[in-house]
Amino acid sequence: MKEKVIVIGGGLAGSEAAWRLANEGHRVILYEMRPKKMTPAHKTGNLAELVCSNTLGGLELTTGAGLLKAEMQKLGSLVIEAAKVARVPAGGALGVDRKIFSEYITEKIESHPNITLIREEVKEIPEDEVVVIATGPLTSDALSEKIKELVGYDTLYFYDAIAPIVEAESVDFSKGFWGSRYGKGGDDYFNCVLTEEEYKKFYEELLKAEKVKPKDFEKAVHFEGCLPIEEMAERGYKTLLFGPMKPVGLVDPRTGKEPFAVVQLRKENKEGTLLSLVGFQTKLTYKEQKRVFRLIPCLRNAVFVRLGSMHRNTFIQSNKVLTHYLNLKKKENIFFAGQITGVEGYVASSATGILAGINAGRLARGEKPLKAPTETMLGALVNYIVTKEGELQPMNPVFGLLPPLEKKVRDKKKRKELMAKRALETMEKWIKENNLVPEGLVKVC
């Protein structure tokens, strides 16, 4: 039996971390507070309970989630194994029977000889042990306080405010100009220009658009200083013109005049292939976001890789406190995994659990932790959350995070196919070089 590792949280990420560590021969103590103490969203005491959708996203390798799932399978993912056992028809997506899925994972964890499952709320972090914290978006108040003390009070967030992100190549750059306010900061922003007539149409449709109904446990959340754009619009016709759409300090070089209104797009990655809509956090439904935001002239044909949202979500500013290994910069024996790291979605959460498990095990054995290659979707996603400049908001796996191909490929589908091929080949090489798949860990269902 190898060294002990503690995992706090029995969701998707915690289950993956525990499974990985146990199969490497470590003695794992897994803490899960349910069913003794429930969250407002969970209904059972099962491990890896899915509280939102019952699909794990698309299977196509040309989608971010599909590619990440393929990488996870190569790493011996328990979540992918369970999803295949519990699979239900869901078109091109990997849909599962929630009950079968969570019961399968619970049984696997409970019956593993190297895992001790303790059903208790953790109120203190054992800072002298190797620990993986994977407590998710609804981390208990007591543990949240301890995490705050550990990472710093300004680096633990309790809600997210996600603005949409579009593919740069889908933006019509003839409908605006690059530049910063008052000429400061260079060409950091692309300014989508709206005439008064275009603004009026956008404003009216924004007010009419359907919103997502908040869950009961989210109703008390106040987004101080970070209002949804539709709520700002409800305060009056000109409110947005003094907020995220203000034209002050910007001169359109095509006219020599200040535009009536602008929507600023900011680069989300170094390559500039992804652009976010600045200040456009929203609670509109996904369908309505696409309809309304495409009324902005430069976004008429926009391809959205992430849509906006605002909801209750406990997560850390990983870019300030974590390394590429998913451990704390200041305390290398403490790892984080799952949604609490600032990744979005079931698959991304699960994948970070695998990586945290790999590196917690290596550290416990006195070995050097490993950085996942950025050519893989797992490596690219982790690289994003730990290196993002400014404020981190949750991110899902998208192709725009991957480094470009050495040779430029114009056809978008072909480009994604080649990126996926490179990612899987890189993952296989990384696994082989570092002996990352213990015998019997990968099961074909």
UniProtKB/Swiss-Prot annotation:
It is an enzyme of class 2 (transferase). It comes from the Bacteria. It is found in: Cytoplasm. Its EC number is 2.1.1.74. Its main location: cytoplasm. GO terms for biological process: tRNA methylation; tRNA wobble uridine modification. GO terms for cellular component: cytosol. It catalyses: uridine(54) in tRNA + (6R)-5,10-methylene-5,6,7,8-tetrahydrofolate + NADH + H(+) = 5-methyluridine(54) in tRNA + (6S)-5,6,7,8-tetrahydrofolate + NAD(+); uridine(54) in tRNA + (6R)-5,10-methylene-5,6,7,8-tetrahydrofolate + NADPH + H(+) = 5-methyluridine(54) in tRNA + (6S)-5,6,7,8-tetrahydrofolate + NADP(+). GO terms for molecular function: flavin adenine dinucleotide binding; tRNA (uracil(54)-C5)-methyltransferase activity, 5,10-methylenetetrahydrofolate-dependent. FAD binds at G9, G10, G11, L12, A13, G14. Keywords: Cytoplasm, FAD, Flavoprotein, Methyltransferase, NAD, NADP, Transferase, tRNA processing. Its cofactor is FAD. Gene3D superfamilies: FAD/NAD(P)-binding domain. HAMAP family: TrmFO. Belongs to the MnmG family. TrmFO subfamily. Catalyzes the folate-dependent formation of 5-methyl-uridine at position 54 (M-5-U54) in all tRNAs. This is Methylenetetrahydrofolate--tRNA-(uracil-5-)-methyltransferase TrmFO. The gene is trmFO.
